[in-house]
A protein has these predicted regions:
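A short hydrophobic beta-strand element
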Residues: 90-100
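Beta-strand elements of well-folded, non-transmembrane domains
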Residues: 98-104, 155
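C-terminal motif of bacterial Sec signal peptides marking the signal peptidase cleavage site
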Residues: 7-10
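Residue-level signal for tight coil/turn positions that link beta-strands
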Residues: 87-91, 157
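Short beta-strand edge/turn micro-motifs at domain boundaries
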Residues: 118-125, 141-183
Length: 185
């Protein structure tokens, strides 16, 4: 009982029962998130090897691994809200807002912090800021960006789906990319 009360308080809001296309999109969103998390987990070992082989020292290696974990945590923590649904039978168009870490504002905050510190080398600042960023992302204490996206859904074999391009844009937004791709923020 105590645990359930704590969980309700920590969520901050009650989750309403989803229905119709909202529920169908929720399934898709969570499948995209699961796929991304699986890819992150599958590549974790490879990333660790790459970090060890491509850096000059342990600090750089740790910074690279922290970057990877920061992106992973931001992606896992991404959420959405449905703003509008246009149901057209076997097709639907949803206006959604994806909420995730605003890396631009977070970086600006860290740079302001750096300016106030005297006698801190760039390397020390990089290490400190990566660790601070990771802590903030894990605790959900970061600036948040809300980005609108139009999602085209279609029904195939009685199952609602989105196409690969839409899925890639959605994943990009879940990572915080304002352009909706994993390679340009």
């Amino acid at each position: 009982m105590l645990i359930s009360s704590f969980m309700l308080v920590s969520c901050g809001e009650k989750k309403e029962e989803l229905t119709g296309l909202h529920k169908e999109f929720d399934i898709i969103f969570n499948e995209v998130k699961e796929e991304g998390v699986s890819e992150f987990n599958a590549n974790k070992e490879e990333i660790a090897k790459e970090a060890k082989n491509s850096t000059r020292n342990e600090k750089e290696e740790k910074a690279m691994l922290n970057t990877y974990e920061i992106m992973f945590e931001a992606f896992k923590g991404s959420t959405y809200s449905v703003e509008n649904i246009n149901d057209m039978g076997d097709k639907a168009e949803l206006q959604i807002k994806v909420k995730t870490v605003d890396f631009i504002k977070l970086t600006e905050e860290l740079l302001e912090n750096y300016k106030s510190k005297n006698n801190v080398s760039e390397e020390e600042f990089l290490m400190e800021s990566m660790e601070e960023m990771l802590k903030k992302v894990k605790k959900g204490k970061t600036p948040v960006i809300e980005q609108e996206i139009t999602v085209q859904m279609f029904k195939e074999n009685d199952k609602w789906k989105i196409n690969d391009n839409t899925k890639n844009v959605l994943m990009g937004k879940m990572f915080g990319s304002q352009k909706g791709t994993l390679f340009s923020f």
